[in-house]
Amino acid sequence: DRGKLFIDKRMYRPALEDFQRALISVIPSFEANDNFAVPEIQNENPYFLTIIAAHFNKGDAFLAWFNREKNPQHLEQALRNYQAAYHQLIVTRNAMGDELSKPFLMGTFQKSIEQSVTCARQLYGATHNARYFQDAFHFVELTKYLNVLDALQRAERANNSGIPKNLLLELKDVR
């Protein structure tokens, strides 16, 4: 991904421009004159994963830029993009169901998910505003939500597999 290469080279503006272009290209109603604009959550869009990735990537770029230059506006923008990524992820998960599995999401966005919690914690540490503390908890809760959905899907598959429940419980005890 070109934008990630820009982040690695500490070229944050071109990285953000790249991620913003990705959003503009897949959301017909979204127009942005700068890299700070965040589009509304999309209820129906065939490019859900591109949208989620662009939000997480913008958050990562703003966080890296903050860590380099200590501009609090960059930290705020990182948080806004992480929030948008999580909200889009929930809408997408509800729309797609099993096709958007927790292992796929965690594998694809693990670093960004961890950085989102770090971002909220840094904002809380800098401002002591309880809202940012709530954001950190909210991000952790959303990660737990993905874990619960994955566990429910595994349980449903086990119930529909024809395997007697007592054997499944024995297997659990063996683990």
Please tell me what each predicted stretch does.
Residues Y12-R175:
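Amphipathic alpha-helical protein-protein interaction segments
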